[in-house]
């Protein structure tokens, strides 16, 4: 029998504190109300900041095994049900509706945060029009990545055979094929009955705006997740063995929000469709627990990325982003401890959404710092503890500056001048 404990908090009590690492459990509110807040709230919570019976507290930090992302205070006397991390697989088996409520709430939150990040960092709304597939094809054609262009043109034509750009897409598709570039049907339309899929390097798994009915688990190799914005490719993440992706389209039956392309090496994936997923909920609770952890990891990282958008100085943004990546990978900083990131300075600048006109100077400053070594496709930090300390120092200075601004804003004035 699943043994859950009840915890009481008096009105005004702190239940969670942002930044603390007490994340071995999460709570379900049984009675009462709880207010949540963040030090840097870039976007309002979709469900609001006042939680009540049936809502969850601390579930993202718990499932991601990362520090708390918010502070929670009891607005009234509250009774909470405590669920330990190790109990989650059993919760899936014994109380599937609660587990699925968490998964679907995570999926909705991810899409909401993804839309917010796109608006803030890329200065535009998420593309949902199928014609964006044609735009993606045009981009990869210009980049001479012909197989990727073929994939995008093919799926545009499949969805919009008589669309605005159909004739051009058809001509482009045939012209590329006439040069000898191969587009085997098993790559354009994988056999959905085959759960294990093997892709060669630089292959398209799915395209932004494409409809999707599967999530994927990487069994071997790496996958790059990106978007095409203003005729340039924005790298969102590099996923590795054991990682999952594509879950939002499966859970919400909505178009893909990003593009997935295999890295340079061969990649093997396990594809899970909706029917398999529904079976796995009851037969493989450990796998569903992993999916929940994956979603929690992504949401935690999105909140961190949103906070990163508020940092005004490019080099400080770059340090903060590297520290986020270390925490994502659960790498404990250490004096003289070296770490290699598998992306270069230009990709880091893209991840930080540094304006194009500032990128060259930001990279030059970044490379001048003593703990940084770099190649085109990797960054080596020679002392991760120093990186962590420098990031913390930058944050402290930002908080002090913010407090000064707030103080000046609150000063009494007489005809526009401070009263001393």
What kind of feature is each model-predicted range?
Residues 1-39, 177-232:
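Regulatory nucleotide-sensing modules
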Residues 7-10, 83, 125-135, 197-200, ...:
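Alpha-helix N-cap/N′ positions at the starts of helices
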Residues 22, 123, 308-312, 338, ...:
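Conserved phosphate/pyrophosphate-binding and hydrolysis machinery centered on Walker-type P-loop NTPases
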Residues 48-49, 53-61, 65-119, 125-179:
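Extended, hydrophobic interaction surfaces within ordered domains
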């Amino acid at each position: 029998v699943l043994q859950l404990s009840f915890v009481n908090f008096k009105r005004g009590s702190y239940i969670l504190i942002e930044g603390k690492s007490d994340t071995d459990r999460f709570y379900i509110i049984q009675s009462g109300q709880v207010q949540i807040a963040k030090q840097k709230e870039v976007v309002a919570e979709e469900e609001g900041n006042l939680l009540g019976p049936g809502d969850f507290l601390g579930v993202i930090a718990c499932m991601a095994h990362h520090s708390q992302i918010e502070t929670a205070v009891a607005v009234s006397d509250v009774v909470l049900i405590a669920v330990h991390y190790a109990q989650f697989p059993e919760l899936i088996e014994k109380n599937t509706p609660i587990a699925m409520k968490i998964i679907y709430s995570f999926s909705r939150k991810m899409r909401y945060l993804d839309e917010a990040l796109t608006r803030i960092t890329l200065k535009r709304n998420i593309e949902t029009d199928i014609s964006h597939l044609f735009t993606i094809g045009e981009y990869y054609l210009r980049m001479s990545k012909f197989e990727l262009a073929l994939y995008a043109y093919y799926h545009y034509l499949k969805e919009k055979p008589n669309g605005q750009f159909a004739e051009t897409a058809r001509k482009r598709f045939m012209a590329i094929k006439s040069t000898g570039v191969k587009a085997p049907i098993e790559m354009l339309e994988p056999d959905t009955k085959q759960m294990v899929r093997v892709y060669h390097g630089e292959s398209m798994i799915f395209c932004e705006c494409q409809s999707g009915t599967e999530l994927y688990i990487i069994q071997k190799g790496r996958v790059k997740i990106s978007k095409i914005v203003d005729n340039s490719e924005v790298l969102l993440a590099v996923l590795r063995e054991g990682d999952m992706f594509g879950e939002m389209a499966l859970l919400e039956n909505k178009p893909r929000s990003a593009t997935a392309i295999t890295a340079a090496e061969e990649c093997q994936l396990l594809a899970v469709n909706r029917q398999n997923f529904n079976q796995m909920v009851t037969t493989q609770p450990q796998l569903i627990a992993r999916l929940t952890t994956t979603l929690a990891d992504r949401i935690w990282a999105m909140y961190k990325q949103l906070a990163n958008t508020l940092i005004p100085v490019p080099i400080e943004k770059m340090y903060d982003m590297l520290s986020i990546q270390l925490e994502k990978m659960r790498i404990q900083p250490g004096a003289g401890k070296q770490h290699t990131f598998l992306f270069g300075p230009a990709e880091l600048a893209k991840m930080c959404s540094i304006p194009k006109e500032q990128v060259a100077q930001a990279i030059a400053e970044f490379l001048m710092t003593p703990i940084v070594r770099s190649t085109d496709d990797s960054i080596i930090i020679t002392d991760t503890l120093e990186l962590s300390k420098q990031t913390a120092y930058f944050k402290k200075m930002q908080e002090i500056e913010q407090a000064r601004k707030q103080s000046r804003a609150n000063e009494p004035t007489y005809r526009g001048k401070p009263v001393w």
